[in-house]
């Protein structure tokens, strides 16, 4: 791990703005943090990189940056995980634009990062990020010579959704696959406890994770169990719990289990929910049991449409951020305010599971089940129609 420190006296002044963070400290990428410097006459740049021996390259990249942005009074930190010079330059430009104008809203949910998703979904200027000015990196990753991220891959805070106070957590999809480590899990658990203590009406979880972080497996599993316990406390307190699973990682492993404890789940066509992924099953049991390269099969087993058809989830939407926002608003209006976790609700869930097991018989995936039980949907090629056609055919729109 190399560290480079640069100090410049630059001619231009820039309006002081709150701290911003752009990019992800994932493989081939980097995190850029910009905040006001204590010395308004100087700009300081610190580079932390896992790739050694490229001081001259960094010197050239930083020199070009200060030529393009000769502003004093900034403190800039780069946490690099092997980004190429063009990527570094791009992230620095994006960070400067964000520092000056704020986080941009994104139309595509999957393309947005964790912060952009929050800012694109919640009411304008309503989000307050917790621990923004605090560094909360993993204590384990540096021991493995892996780059840390200052927020450990999850953004938490409070906001308003259609005027309703909410707590919200958003997983950073590109930081080790949105995986749950010690700090990552503790932040989610702390947010849940905050919502209970302050009696917030709802918690929104923007889930995009492959599950527990393998590098922190034991503490990650503990965090999953603590989050589940806190969610059950939340539901018993009458706080609505809503999960949005519309990202490329889906919800697998411990996060897949957590998703099953929430009141209301929203998915799109690209979503996947499971415990063990197709690649894991193939590695353990062989390709004859599960061919992970058969992508249509993978989505018929784990996919958002399958989960919606099986009533595992309550809301189906598109990849557009505004459609997902509308789905969240619908969930907030649909869910009752009374506590949702009681004996009757548990018995009803068990009854539904028994019916599902009985109807499954020897079917191995949803396509087979539809062919035997819902021929009208099977004949319409339900997995390949548009989102609008899918909702119309399933009679579960809005």
Predicted features along the sequence, with ranges:
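Glycine-rich anion/phosphate-binding loops
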Residues: 55-57, 148-153, 178-193
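Conserved mixed alpha/beta catalytic, RNA-binding, or beta-rich assembly cores of soluble enzyme
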Residues: 15-17, 22-31, 44-47, 51, ...
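Short Pro/Gly-enriched beta-strand edge/turn motifs at strand-loop
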Residues: 11-17, 134-144
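N-terminal short beta-loop-beta anion/metal-coordinating cradle
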Residues: 145-162
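A structural preference for short, pocket-lining loop segments at secondary-structure junctions
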Residues: 161-172, 186-213
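N-terminal intrinsically disordered, cationic/polar leader segments
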Residues: 1-103
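Amphipathic alpha-helical segments at domain termini/boundaries
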Residues: 101-136, 283-398
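Conserved catalytic cores of soluble enzyme domains
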Residues: 210-341
């Amino acid at each position: 791990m190399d560290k480079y420190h640069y100090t410049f006296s630059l001619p231009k002044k820039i309006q002081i703005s709150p701290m911003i963070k752009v990019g992800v400290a994932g493989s081939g990428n980097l995190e850029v943090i910009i905040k006001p410097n204590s010395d308004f006459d100087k700009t300081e740049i610190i580079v932390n990189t896992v790739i050694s021996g490229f001081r001259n390259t960094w010197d050239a990249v930083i020199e070009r940056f200060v030529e393009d942005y000769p502003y004093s009074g900034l403190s800039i930190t780069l946490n690099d995980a092997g980004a190429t010079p063009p990527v570094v330059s791009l992230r620095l430009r994006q960070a400067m634009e964000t520092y000056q104008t704020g986080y941009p809203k994104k139309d595509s949910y999957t393309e947005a990062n964790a912060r952009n998703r929050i800012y694109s979904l919640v009411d304008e200027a309503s989000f307050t990020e917790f621990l923004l000015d605090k560094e909360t990196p993993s204590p384990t990753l540096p021991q493995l010579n892996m780059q840390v991220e200052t927020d450990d891959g999850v953004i938490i805070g409070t906001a308003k959704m259609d005027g309703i106070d909410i707590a919200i957590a958003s997983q950073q999809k590109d930081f080790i696959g949105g995986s749950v480590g010690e700090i990552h899990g503790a932040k989610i658990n702390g947010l849940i406890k905050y919502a209970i203590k302050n009696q917030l009406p709802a918690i929104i979880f923007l889930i995009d994770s492959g599950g527990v972080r393998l590098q922190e497996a034991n503490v990650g599993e503990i965090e999953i169990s603590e989050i589940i316990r806190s969610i059950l406390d939340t539901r018993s307190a009458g706080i609505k719990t809503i999960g949005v699973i519309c990202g490329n990682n889906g919800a697998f492993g411990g996060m897949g289990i957590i998703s099953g404890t929430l009141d209301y789940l929203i998915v799109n066509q690209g979503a996947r929910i499971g415990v063990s992924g197709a690649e894991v099953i193939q590695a353990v049991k062989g390709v004859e049991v599960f061919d992970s390269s058969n992508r249509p099969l993978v989505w018929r087993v784990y996919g958002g449409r399958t989960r919606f058809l099986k009533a595992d989830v309550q809301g189906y939407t598109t990849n557009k951020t505004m459609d997902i926002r509308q789905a969240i608003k619908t969930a907030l209006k649909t869910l009752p305010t009374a506590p949702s976790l009681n004996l009757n609700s548990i018995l009803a869930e068990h009854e539904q599971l028994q019916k599902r097991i009985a109807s499954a018989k020897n079917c191995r995936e949803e396509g087979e089940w539809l062919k035997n039980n819902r021929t009208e949907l099977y004949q319409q090629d339900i997995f390949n129609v548009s989102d609008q056609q899918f909702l119309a055919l399933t009679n579960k729109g809005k």
